[in-house]
Amino acid sequence: MILQLLFYSLFTHLAVSQIDVNQALNQNKLNIDTISSSAISDAELEKTFPRTNLSRMRNALKSLRQNWSAKLQAMPARNYQNAGTNQENGATEQQKPLREKPRDRVKMEGDTLHQVNKAAGLNDILYQGDMVLTDDQIATILEARDETTVSTASRARRQAYRDRYYPSTTWGSSVYYYYDRTATPKIVKAFEQAVAFWQNVTCINIMQSSTAINRIRVFKGQGCYSYVGRISGVQDLSLGTGCEEFGTAAHELGHALGFFHTQSRYDRDNYISINYANIDPSYVEQFDKETSNTNFNYGMPYDYGSIMQYGATSASSNDKATMIARDTEYQDTMGSDFVGFYDISMMNEHYKCKELCPAASSAQCKNGGFPSPRNCAICICPSGYGGILCDQRPPGCGDSVTATTTWQTLTNTIGDGLPTLRDNHTMCNYWVKAPDNQAVEIRISGLTTVTIDGCIFGGVEIKTHKDQKLTGYRYCSSADQNTVHRSTGSLVPIILFNRYASTKAVLEYRAVTPSVDVSATYTTFAPIVNSCQDLHPNCDFYKFFGMCRSKKIRSNCKFTCHDCNNNNASPFGSNFFNNNYNSFNNWYTNKNKNYYPYSNSNNNKPWMWFF
């Protein structure tokens, strides 16, 4: 029965992944009337969203979708696989084809916020997938789309929400929240982690109070959503089933503190292109963007690794990319569950925290860090940097190595190898240093982990940009093998991270002469696997249950399934060292039922856990 369920999941997924992208949109024509309304009754919705005029919200979203439908119908049919489309003029834009990377599925309720909310049936009342709006926000964000009808001063300004009432729409120095009786221990744990994070890196005090006039009610609703900014009185923040994780909680709390989505920035077309053929019509408004008059980003660049950036396949009708990074090496970085350094910096600007640390008497931070508003003598550092002044490698797992002109190898495997989600990532920080006036070249020789938007379950981050405040390139697919990056400086931080099964990376590095063009240079090659390697993190699991008879599994688990045609075998990617199946069997006997990879004990449906 176990094998039947797993093979059913595997081949169903493979079949769905081959849907024709042009057929999905019927040559760009969206029928707005076919969009289903919420699966929840209006009476229940009115209780769930007491601060929102549901009829007005639905009409505003429908109007926005109709506007988008008109735009799309005006565009000629085209092949969207290897090209993006400019939102403003509909012109085809040739881009480097994306490497094929079939996505894994880990959680039955959905691995991403969009998947969870789609299953909850909230598509017709949430803006951009997870935001609840007040009447005033509906008016300024959705209804006032015409520049000639509403003055710039009266309109919403975002990524950080700044309307005509700013800064009174922020929380000031104190934010209050309380837990509804529906909040489970998992919700409390995830939200407390998000509270601790945002509080530690800003001047905002986030405290529990069930009596404060303005407060957030944290509860278990259907899906994940929040209001944007402080709306006065009690406002809801839902962390339903599938949302009880740090990344989602930090994202929703980011909304409550005043953040909108990164992909709605007015300048987003310079950084991502939209693949309209793959968009689920119910979520077409998710890709709405602002103008330069309505968008306020505090002068900060677009960060693909922002906690407020949706994943590349978000709102997809066919599991294919709806957003394509113009720097395609950033494709898997989008959808992160880490809070980006620019998120932290922008939140500090939005709440005027940086004004608390006078430049003359505060820490002189290195590598783009800034003084902590909690203690101006120490710095808040970009990822990959630590120490009081951001001039040291973060403590713990990792190492500092010196690059020479000869290729050297860095190899590590982190994670326990078991298909259970952990609350926190295991992290290893490496510094690769070249001699002064030389650059570092990094090549991914091997990578085994779970492949998913944002690499939220594990992967490797490589920081070669001149601006070290930006999130680095993140990878979590064996298809990324033989990717090469050349740094703009003599130091490259590398971060290996994991919180599900295991992640193994084999990286090669050497010192080279800097390129003439020092702006984010890199070279990529098609993946070539010459040695006998496992290309999936769960090969031992498949062998344990006799699944090596499958040609598909043998091709991805050559070492474990003994399907090698040469003697250059290496146990790349093995999760259970020394083939210790007795330990794996002990885990199987005492498994965590919350993340049972074989079948769901409640409805006997298979976990979608495959290549």
Swiss-Prot record:
SMART domains: ShKT, ZnMc. Residues 159-354 form the Peptidase M12A domain. Glycans are attached at residues 53, 67, 200, 424. Metalloprotease. Residues 532-564 form the ShKT domain. Residues 340-396 form the EGF-like domain. Residues 82-103 are annotated as: Disordered. The gene is nas-31. It is an enzyme of class 3 (hydrolase). Its main location: secreted. It comes from the Eukaryota. The active site is at 252. Residues 82-95 have a biased composition (Polar residues). Keywords: Cleavage on pair of basic residues, Disulfide bond, EGF-like domain, Glycoprotein, Hydrolase, Metal-binding, Metalloprotease, Protease, Secreted, Signal, Zinc, Zymogen. Residues 18-158 form a propeptide. GO terms for molecular function: metalloendopeptidase activity; zinc ion binding. It holds the Pfam family Astacin. It is found in: Secreted. Residues 1-17 form the signal peptide. Residues 397-516 form the CUB domain. The keyword Chaperone does not apply. Its cofactor is Zn(2+). This is Zinc metalloproteinase nas-31. The keyword Zinc applies.
